[in-house]
Amino acid sequence: MPIRIGFGPLILFVFSCIGIYLACGRHATTRMFAKKFYLFIVLYAVWSLGLILFRGEPFHDNRQIGYTLLITIFAFAGSGMVLIRDPLRAYVLGARVGTLLAVIIAVCLSIVDGGRIGIGGNQAVFAFVAGVAAISAAIPLRNTSRYLPNGPHWLVLGFAAVLTSETRAVIVVLPIFVAVEILIFLKRFSIRQQGAAYAILFAATAALVVVGPVGSIISKRFSGMVEYYDTGRAADWEDKISADIREVMWTSASRVIAAHPFTGVGSYSKMDFVEAEAGDKATMLNGFRHVHNTILDELLNDGIVGLIFMAGAFISIFVYLWRTADSWAMRRALIYFAVICGSYGMLHNPLLHEVTIASTMFFLAALNAAASRRMMAARRAGLISYIFGKKSAA
């Protein structure tokens, strides 16, 4: 199993073990959780691991086994976190501390060493984890610590950390989240105060873009691409090779999927199939373990059936958390999380790296545990259900 020792994933694993124990023991704290989510996750695990056994794939160096087990085990972390008095508060405060550390360390490394900042050399993974941490940190808390206050500044700090990775899939969406949260945050002030704040923000943004590092990073990662599509000159796009590789991978993967739609070809040998379809361009794909697109990767691994189980799991937990959210701020966080996962998943895959899997499941587990505790509190108050804006009396 490809597990890197990390404090966050280790904590999540402990909560997952507790959650599995409580679920197997049919403990009362787990009975009101999102049952459809767990059902689809278990079905996905059985299907994915069953296909691996059916195909006779080797266990050694088979990353799909590890990733499937991680997703399945971490799915039960919410059941373990429900034992914490306020799981959401603990998670959000931890995310705020993590965001602070991420931006400080990333900026320092960028200044001292230069280049793109990543986790284990993987810049995209760092960008995704920092982005999810910033979204989590921006969730408002009641009676929050004065040293870690509520506000949109957490998204700004997260964006600063993500910029050091120069990962386009995350850079393009975080500024939208920042703008929305700043607009909502400033509504509490007078029109005059809002005008002054907007003027300061506009001036600061312009300074960072024109004379600061933001402009150079954006120019480096986006300008060449825009100029290429405007002029057609490949020389204008410095890293066009990355787009060319993805085009070959995705085109070849689509042909493989068309030939094996229901069960896929398996993670262990999928790149062999893709390279065979690539023909004389196969050398461009040397060293790649997946096709850098969540949907295509899943269709290659487990086919349409596996994709249905996976999509069913994440759609069901999203709907459950949306219905049981206690504020519109929580719902916005869910939207931001879905958008960043979608944006990242189009060019990478958050479910094919142990760190991004842990980040994804930690977010869902914390919100899931908080929702369960709200539902249990509603039951104790004589209500039969808790849905945001609708509390049904017993």
Map each language-model feature to its residues.
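Alpha-helical transmembrane segments of multi-pass inner-membrane proteins
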Residues: 73-114, 119-188, 211-213, 339
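Hydrophobic transmembrane alpha-helices of multi-pass, membrane-embedded glycosylation machinery
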Residues: 13-20, 156, 171-183, 358-365
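Long extracytoplasmic/lumenal interhelical loops at the membrane interface
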Residues: 236-251, 255-259, 263-302
